[in-house]
Amino acid sequence: MAKASQRAPVLGPAFIRLLARFKDDATSPTAPDVSARLATWFDWNRAITLSRALDNPPAPAPDGATFDPDHDADCTRVRDRLLQAIHAEIAPVAPADAAAPDPYAPYRQHYQAQQRAMQTATGNLRGRLRDMLARQSPAKARLAEVDAVMEATLSPREHTLLSHVPALLCLHYQRLHDSAASADAQASATTTALFLQDLRTALLAELEVRFHPIEGLLAALRTR
């Protein structure tokens, strides 16, 4: 008896594996060479700026500020506000609108609105933490400068990559609803609920990705 083919596991972080499932990609991508990939993302100007941040003697810290627990509380407030928006109820597309030319449009708009909120909130928070880090010590001021260069260099790439997530979710939406096209209303509602759960899961995973630099800055702020 012939064995059923098994899908090769997709390597990488949970967010990447989730997106691969939405794409229904049966191949396991080769892990990229991170250093080679970063080299293509840095133009000469960025590379020189980063080199200066790493090589120049750090400037004296202005006031030697210590870690303030309010920074933790600020991060928690920002995260909680974004989580509340992600978990807010999403109105499913009405059955009468399911035959519209683009029934996925409300979900796309919702996801993109959440992305904009996350980008604004995490960007502002990252800047505030970096300013505080720069005031703690000369070494931490250098770290803050490096983080600023990395954000300026990588954020446009990150924005471009994350902008493709709604399109992958659209493929997932179409696949789910094509499979339920001949089902009854209850089965269709179940399919919609499953999709909305996956949409929230994607937003939660993206939020974690966006908070990685913030968590790194917080850890640096706590270090004496």
Question: How should these model regions be labeled?
Answer:
Residues 220, 224:
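Inter-helical turn/loop segments and adjacent helix faces that build the functional surface
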Residues 1-108:
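N-terminal leader/presequence regions that precede the main folded/catalytic core
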Residues 80-212:
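Extended, well-ordered protein cores
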